[in-house]
């Protein structure tokens, strides 16, 4: 009895020391005890199953450990009990003690837990039944591309948190690392079939309040679905380690009523049409430089760095680069292989340099090429017009 008392005393002291160290840090942290508020059927089912499992596990834990602790105290050697020699079930009671727990575990695993989990998984994978629209999500280092095939809308979404906040040069905002320049807009109450793929490495599209976390894998088209039940803005991020700026790939979804969604579609189409029309316009140097700076900061600075110094050997410097300041066209006016413009349009095989011809408009490519050739100490002085890019695609 004295040994048991000493053990309990030491355990209590150890637990007190651990709690004294941990509780202050928990008090200062934004700590969540449960899942975020679900806003889709998948998230709600997941939460309900989680709570159901926790109840079953808690009952099992209390029952099993209660019996164990009672047996250890009740049948201890100090009160005269002798150890039994157990060679296997021999009597009816011993057979019951062996078979009843086995039957209980089967019931718990296959009925209490298995049936609800089975139906939830089947529902999660039913992406096509009664789907109202399709959203295609393409992951790339380190941004997302969203496409609405039914509406002819396609655009990039990149993190908009200022780099000065990341470098601790200014105070961090409310949605630090969870804000983007172009959010996803979806209608409330509509089942959206989500198709996912990637252009480079594996990414994971994850929005906690949707209960959705699905890998985007190069060469594969994977599926999931969401049906948002409440208007609002929902934030997530890439949940798969995908390289240098993995932590800078947020996902922001704005759920709106259907009428507001249709108005957004019309507005987005108008903006995209205006951007396409920019290919036939002659841009001034100031216009190209201003637009190019914006494109560079969103699409290029993450690898080539804000001042064009790069991060060798993976991300070459643009400042003083012979490729950036070299010729773009041959004497016949054709695009030179491996030139600055060719690399931006078609990428560089075997490197992290991806092709931008399918993600940036003619005007954006012309602007960023002009900006890079006339910044970071590069003084090429020439201008690239969107019409030139259009003709060389």
Regions found by a protein language model. Give the residues of each.
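The canonical Cys-X-X-Cys-His
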Residues: 194, 238-239, 292-306, 344, ...
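Alpha-helical transmembrane segments
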Residues: 49-75
């Amino acid at each position: 009895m004295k040994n048991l008392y000493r053990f309990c005393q030491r355990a209590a002291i150890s637990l007190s020391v651990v709690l004294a160290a941990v509780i202050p840090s928990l008090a200062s942290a934004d700590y969540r005890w449960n899942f975020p508020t679900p806003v889709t059927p998948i998230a709600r089912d997941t939460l309900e199953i989680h709570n159901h499992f926790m109840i079953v596990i808690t009952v099992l834990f209390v029952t099993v450990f209660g019996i164990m602790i009672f047996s250890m105290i009740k049948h201890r050697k100090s009160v005269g009990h002798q150890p039994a020699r157990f060679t296997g079930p021999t009597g009816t009671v011993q057979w019951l003690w062996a078979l009843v727990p086995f039957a209980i575990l089967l019931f718990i695993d296959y009925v209490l837990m298995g049936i609800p989990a089975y139906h939830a998984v089947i529902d999660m994978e039913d992406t096509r039944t009664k789907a109202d629209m399709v959203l295609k999500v393409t992951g790339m280092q380190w941004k997302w591309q969203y496409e609405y095939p039914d509406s002819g809308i396609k655009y990039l979404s990149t993190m908009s948190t200022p780099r000065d906040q990341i470098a601790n040069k200014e105070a961090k905002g409310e949605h630090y690392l969870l804000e983007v320049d172009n959010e996803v807009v979806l209608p409330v109450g509509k089942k959206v079939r989500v198709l996912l793929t990637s252009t480079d490495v594996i990414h994971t599209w994850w929005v906690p309040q949707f209960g959705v976390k699905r890998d985007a894998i190069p060469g594969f088209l994977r599926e999931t679905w969401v049906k948002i039940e409440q208007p609002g803005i929902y934030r997530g991020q890439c949940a798969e380690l995908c390289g240098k700026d993995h932590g800078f790939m947020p996902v922001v979804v704005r759920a709106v009523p259907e009428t507001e969604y249709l108005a957004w579609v019309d507005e987005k189409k108008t903006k995209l049409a205006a951007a396409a029309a920019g290919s036939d316009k002659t841009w001034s140097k100031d216009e190209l430089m201003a637009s190019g700076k914006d494109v560079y900061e969103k699409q290029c600075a993450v690898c080539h760095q804000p001042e064009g110094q790069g991060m060798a050997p993976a991300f070459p410097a643009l400042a003083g680069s012979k490729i950036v300041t070299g010729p773009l066209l041959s004497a016949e006016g054709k695009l030179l292989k491996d030139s600055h413009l060719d690399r931006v349009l078609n990428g560089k095989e075997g490197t992290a340099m991806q092709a931008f011809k399918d993600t940036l408009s003619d005007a954006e490519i012309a602007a960023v090429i002009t900006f890079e050739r006339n910044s970071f100490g590069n003084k090429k002085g020439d201008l690239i017009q969107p019409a030139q890019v259009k003709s060389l695609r």
